[in-house]
Amino acid sequence: MKNFTCQCCGQCCKWEGFVIAKEDEMAAAAKLLGITLDEFIQKYTKLSQDRKSLIFADRADGACVFLSDDNRCKIYEARPWQCRTFPHEWDVPPDMQKLCPGHRLAERADATAAEALPLIHVLGHPALPMDITNAPGDAQVLNCHNFCLMLSLLGLPYIYYGCPGSKLPPGGAFVDCGKPIGKWSYRNKWHQIYNKRLSKHLAKCARLDGKPEIIASIYGAAQSDIETFGLPVIEAMVGYDHCWAPYRVFPSYAHQHTIYAQQPDFTAKNRFFDTVIPHFLDDTQYWPSSNPQDYLLFIGRDAPGKGLAVAQQAAEKTGLELKVVHNGCFGAAKTELLANARAVLMPTLYVEPFGYVAIEAQMCGTPIITTDWGAFAETVLHGLTGFRCRTQAEFVAAIRKTPQLDRNFIRDYALNHFSIKKIAPKYKAYFDFVWNVHKNGGYYADAAFRDATFL
């Protein structure tokens, strides 16, 4: 519960039940008490009735051993997750939940806060279900997933309009737009049918009650012919070669400038309301290696613009193995491959809008070697988290110098700049900004600030 604050009534610590003692939680509590884990186990735990696990001991009156006389927890800062989430995330009867005054207060506060939360209508992938396990190489499926995961983290209600088989993060509702009748291309038959379906579903799901409500387009022109019903449309995570909505979020200034140059007349109408927010990743899916190996890695599509030939030539000059992965690598296997590499090569020849692989590598603490243009100028710290190169001599020298870089610093940089937890508040601020300018005068709206820097 977002607004839960313990009222120190002691009710939950006196209820019949038991707290399972997990090793990491016992270790944290032992550290707080200034004793060893073994001492903690001996003094404060006992075997469960089925003798399969340790549970926290009880006082003589049946209350938790850590409950003080003034109804406070002696290990509150290190209390187990089981205690942190009781009773509001447990399968507890409502009449027992009502015994917790903190829970009752939080329910009222959460209900009040929910009234002000924007409802986000997420227009997803027009041809593939949102399932990153089945489409690990599709950047737009990843964008859809990450965007919804971010909304879930922010606690924002959302509705995802997508293909059958989509797997949503918690907190969202799913609207099935039906199976695609073919591949999408601009204004083809599937485009027209798809936009009609979207409009029909939006008509049913939109609140249109004056409360904050936003449409988020995650697939560009595929959704450009929808009926918006007067709601503001944000084109979020614009990494493709066009734009159509009045509010746009670019992943880099490099890509923003590219689109402004390609569509000068269209973007001039409302570029005052655009913003730049980097793409982001769930950092829990990436970890460093304690013993990295001495191979180089290239992950990317088998396309000339990805610069594979540049990577191969540079690797050959150094005599190091270059592992090449074009698709099918996902999850823990991908993270291990990234984390154990000496360096990841990403010599993209075109102006890269963002480049997820560069961020994935850095989240693993692995140096990234790129070309010196596009988004890399904004995502790679030259000489610190990797190298940005223009000649073969520079690529070769970069490969040889990567062992000198601090892999802990590289990972910390990525976590602080591209993790979902760091980026989510930027999107929330932009949602508030868009609703404000949409409802209150556009450019001249009071307090039309995209972020807290102006406050």
Model-inferred region functions:
Residues 114-455:
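Catalytic cores of nucleotide-sugar-dependent glycosyltransferases that transfer UDP/GDP/TDP-activated
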